Amino acid sequence: MAFYELRQYKVWPGKMDEWVSFMEKEIIPFQISKGMVITGSFRGEEDDSTYIWLRRFEDEKSREKLYADVYESDQWKNEIAHRIPELLDREGMIVTRIVPTPKSTSQ
């Protein structure tokens, strides 16, 4: 059964525009190139520290493969991962697995 990850991040003060640019120009295109399905990304309308994005997985096996393809890659380790802590409070990261309700259009 398909499920989503609702990923909520706390962006360091004054870093939201830089974070959004990094996500939209580097992280999201890279993850999509590895097969990740990104269904949306959002920033807080009134809270400039809140960034949320959604990723969809067909099942746990595909999630595990995609995680390995992304996070164990040389590009992630050498070009992307080290830049994240200067933009995000990793302690404030919340990842919630969610499933669509029966009548949801997000099956």
Give the role of each language-model region.
Residues 43-44:
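Short beta-strand micro-motifs enriched in acidic
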Residues 98-105:
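Specificity-determining recognition surfaces
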Residues 13-15, 59-61, 101:
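Residues that cap or initiate secondary-structure elements
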Residues 10-20:
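Short, surface-exposed ligand-recognition loops at beta-strand->loop->(often short) alpha-helix junctions
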Residues 18-40, 56-96:
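An amphipathic, aromatic/His-enriched active-site/gating alpha helix that lines ligand/cofactor pockets
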Residues 4, 8, 49-62:
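Accessory recognition modules or surfaces
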